[in-house]
Each structure stands twice: as C-alpha cells, then as structure tokens.
C-alpha cells in the first residue's frame, strides 16, 4: 500500500466519518488501517469499489468474510487472513454492510460545479503539432505514478507525458477522428485530452465511483457508467457539460450499479450492463434510431403506442443472468456475456431483445478482453479466463466451443491484429505471470512463450496500426513497454515506464480492429 496515501486517509478520517465514529471504535480503526487506502476513508471507493450495502447486494455476508480473508481473484484485493483475526475479519464484514450516516449523492449541479476548463497556452491547431502519424499514436496509461505517455508508434519515442487523475480506468476512449482521447478515473473524473495539441482540454467529476466510459460513434456524447451513485451520466463530448443523469433502476425501483457501458456504433446506441439487475439497456443516441417503448406494444415496428421521449431513452432487455462482462459480435447484433462465478455464458440478441443461447464457459471468462478472427471460413470469438489456464475459442454461428487452448496460467488479456497470424495472451493470475503466450490463430496451437522480464508481471499486448509490432507491458513500478517484431517475435526496443497498465493505438481503436477490445 502507498504509505503517503494511507497517511492522508488517516488524517482525513476524523472529518469524514460520521460523528458517532470519531471515537474510532476498533472496527473503524481496522478499516482505516487496512481498507481506506483503496476503498476510501468513507467507503465511497478509490482504486477499489465503494463498500456500501447498496453495492454489495449480490455478495452474501459469508462470502464477504471469505473475500476479506482470502482476497478476490483478478483484482488487487489481497487476503488479510495472515494479518487479522477471524473476529476482526467478521467485524469488518459487518461494518461494510452498515449504511453510512448520510447517504452519498452526486447531483448534476455538483457535476457542473466540478467542471474544469484548461485554457490553451497558444491557439490550438486543427492539425497535429508534431512530426508523427496521428493514427499510429499510442496512449500509455502509467498507473505507477498516475501519468500518461503519448508514444509515437513508428519511432517508439515519447511525444508527451502528463499527470492524470488518480486511479484511471485502463480503457481510454477516442473521438471518431482520433483527435481527442477521454479518460475515466475510478473516483468519477472524466478528462478530455487533445492529441493534436498535446494538452488537457477539460475535466468533470461525473460520479463518486465510476466503472468506465464510452464515446458515441458520431463524436457527440460521452456516457459514464457509475457504481456510485447508481447511474449513467451523458456528457456533451465537446464541452463535457452534463446533459442527463439516468438512474439505474428497474421498473420496481430496485437500483443497481452499472457494470459497463460501450458504444455500439452500427446501432447508433450505447449498451449498458447492470451489475445488480438481470437487464441490459440499449440507449440510442442517433436521430434515426427506432423509437423506444416502455411496456408492451403490439408491434414496435409499426410505431404503435407512446414512445419514450429523448434524449437517451432506455430500451430494457431482460436477460437470463447478470452480465458482469460482455463482448459484441462483429455485426453488433449479439452481446456475449457472463456473470462472475457462473459456469455458462449467455448470448443476447439485441434485435429480438432476449437471451438466445448459452455457452459452456468454465472458470471466470474475461469476455471484455475477447477478440475475433476468421478460422476455417467462419468467425470465432476467443476469450481469456481469469480463473482457469485456458483460452476458449467459440464459433459465433453455433455458439459452441471449438477448442480450449491450455496456457501456462489464468490470464487477463488476449490481443491480435488483422495482419498477424498470432494472438498473444498473458498468465497474469498465476505464478507464471512473467510469461506471454503466442498462439497460432489457424492451428490454435501455442507457438512461443516469451518472458520479457523474468519474475515480473507481463501483460496487455497492443499492436501498431499496421500490425508489424506488438507492444507488451511490464506491470511494475520499474516497468517498461517492450516492443516485439510481430513476425520474428524478437525484441526491438524497450522503454522504461512506471507500471504501464495498458497502451492503446488510435487507429486500432477507432477502426474497431478485430484484434483489440472496443
């Protein structure tokens, strides 16, 4: 844990805790010592999620005790069984299920008051102000010291490095023309950065504990998915002014965290998954989108009934199980998702608006990191697994698993490119976390194992725009970006960086490359 951040959290605790807690009874002191640095001194979240009863609906108290004792796979949550007694662990579990004295909220007025506009030092140019291909830039998120680096993807040289908000989510999003990149932080901040002029433009706090953001394919809107408050927030992509707050609740008023939101460009809509409701939402933003009806109508294609008024109407799709993670097929007609701990994935057709198929997926598939490619004349989807040492390869016509590829250990990411015969994965959640595995996309066999920094975590590969080079991250404070020739698999260059959690190529993201996440 960061000693300075823990000290600041402890200093802030008396002012932030309810009056009854200022005497620091044992459980509050335990929380301050072991939990506040990640989950916030008032349990509102930080690098870790908010720990409040409304955010723990799906977690039984007995399971919470187990998580505190043993940790949680695929997260930074480490177990405390060796540091705390069973009584202390049970006390902490009871504490996080206790409502706070004052219910947390974040209103649209507070959002507007938080907005920051950074004036340019000189007039902005409408063309890149550097000698590099703007479509082959990488945005590298360095979580080690909360910075981002803009990297030239041809020379592999940094063009700029700047401080970011604390605890960025690993997936920044780009405007359709590639000029702007938008960052979302776990504590609710959304930041807009101009890649042409290499400067921060504006920022706004759109929530207290945020999951991720999405940018509409027409470049007009940013949608923010929040764990706290339970909401989606639509922002103007030009100004970052808030346009609408959509409460995440079902028809009976039961609220939910928002697991994730993504842009479905061919549909002109955002798709959001709800953490605590068996629903996904389609939220059209295109003026030509079909009307949205709440309740039953005879035939929505005949425009019968009274449509929900915009902007951002919500079309509710009930599904068979929760979707904690999901992936679009190539046509954006189907969503493939799974609940954490479920033994099967599900396919939801967005046109017929229901679950249509289930898929046998053991362990904990990380479908949000899935990719697709053509295999024997058909398209397959491949997903890593956070719990099992396998890559599941799925036929997207039959929704059957055609092969499970055994890897050195459970992994987090899978990446490829249209111009390479290989897919790359990691073994992040295993003793072999220093190993990258290279898989032939046609034979579905492992062709190489690479250890760019023995003993150190290697993960998250991203390709250059042309697919010639693969960039891997060494996830350590004394980490690096390691550049490989994607054909020979030989190292080309190494750039020292502070825990580079991910790097994102402009071209691959805005063209929705089949080899990267969207």
Can you say where each PLM-predicted feature lies in the sequence?
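Residue-level detector of Asp-centered blade-edge/turn motifs that repeat once per structural unit
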Residues: 133-134, 176-177, 217-218, 265-266, ...
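Asp-box/WD-like beta-propeller blade repeats and closely related beta-sheet repeat scaffolds
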Residues: 206-278, 297-314
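Short loop/turn segments that connect beta-strands within beta-propeller blades
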Residues: 153-155, 195-198, 237-240, 285-287, ...
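Repeated scaffold domains used in trafficking and secretory/extracellular systems
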Residues: 126-127, 168-173, 210-215, 254-262, ...
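Extracytoplasmic electron-transfer domains, predominantly the class I c-type cytochrome c fold
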Residues: 37, 42-47, 51-101
